[in-house]
Amino acid sequence: MKIAIIGGGASGIIAAITAKRLNKNIEIDIFDANKSIGKKILASGNGRCNISNTTISSKNYLGESPTFVDFALKEFDFKAFLKFCKTIGLLLDIKENGKVYPLSNEAKSVTNLFSLALEELNVNIFCEHFVQKVEKKDDKFIIYANDKEFKSYDKVLISSGLAAAPQLNATEIGLEIASSFGHTFNPTYPSLVGLQTKETYKGKLQGVKKECSVGLYINGSFEQEILGDVLFTAYGVSGFAILDISQRAVLALTQFYDVELRVNFFPKTSINDLANQIQTLFKNLPKQKAVDILTGLISNKIAPILLEICKIDINTKADDINTKQIKSIAHQLNSWRLKVVDTQGFSHAEASGGGVKTSEVDNKTFESKLIKNLFFAGEVLDIVGNRGGYNLHFAWASGYLVGKNLITDK
């Protein structure tokens, strides 16, 4: 039996290892566009590789049907992943927040050990091979790569991901191949990505970073709230809180909804207490400019913009600020509104949303419901996880199940 795996990422790698361990007589070829496999693994977690998470459920995923992941997460939960990692010599560092990293704290350890496992099992790896199309003739799949017909195969796994990180040769060739076999897909979009905002003053806030709570409002209705770092940039906002909230925000943008963020700079302080603090500051320094006094509370980049939004002259002294204006300042700091107009795109995204419709794929085997012996795994499917190791774990879990089912003759 000959098997082709299109994409040497997490799901493709673990599928190959699993299948070969179960049947050493099969021949497996992995095709990857890069000079070496696992490039996205190397880039994950800022080079540290947030490889998994100890607490995982369908609640950590978005897509056409998030519960599609339930069977895979049950069959290949964190304990199963931990056991698998030990078989290739990969030791893990489990953090208190549930995030999991290689004990070496380097993503390179992950790719090295998986590569050694593939080599030991005699899996063929064809790097810098750009798969352009797949055809089915009789019961065989024909792979075309680098402008020529390559080989024929009994089974094919599409684990090529989507367009996130095009600098790593990420493309949507998997969707093109799926479409050629009659599959449909939901539109793709960047996920876990910085957000561009409409406000004209945004460049003046570049570099400001603070822990905040961020509320997401879609068409004026509250959707979600996230606590975490917010980084103001020349284009808008980034930081962990923004990456987390971007998933639902970007999905709403693709549906042409109005998307607004409301940033609370002091999430642990009530609006009344904040107003009292500001009033006390102004009372203690009545002859100083309000804008200068506010820098004891908030960044000196934010203070002048804050007064401008509250329609208070920047040269106004503290004792000239009335109670109504103080409440206005406190309210603005409690609910700073930003209109989201776009994202930073796939080149800055950690993941992609959208993809092959999961309703067309068996959730237990990950085989196509339309084409026998055609399989899908990982990001190419319309499943995207939250930040924190969830996307990589779905890649491992889906690839593992594919590996088990690639060896069966049905």
Language model segments and positions:
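A glycine-rich dinucleotide-binding beta-alpha-beta segment and adjacent secondary-structure elements
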Residues: F126-C127, K133, P304-V384
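A conserved FAD-binding loop/helix module that cradles the flavin
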Residues: A163-I177, F181, I383-D409
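Glycine-rich FAD pyrophosphate-binding loop
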Residues: A4, K20-N46
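Glycine-rich loop(s) and the adjacent beta-strand/alpha-helix scaffold that form part
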Residues: K155-Y201
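Short hydrophobic core segments
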Residues: A4-I6, F31, V131, F150-Q167, ...
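Feature captures the FAD/FMN-dependent oxidoreductase FAD-binding
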Residues: E75-K155, A303, L307
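Glycine-rich active-site loop/strand segments that organize a redox cofactor
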Residues: N46-N97
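An anion/pyrophosphate-binding glycine-rich loop and adjacent beta-alpha core
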Residues: K35-I37, A43, I51-S58, T184-P187, ...
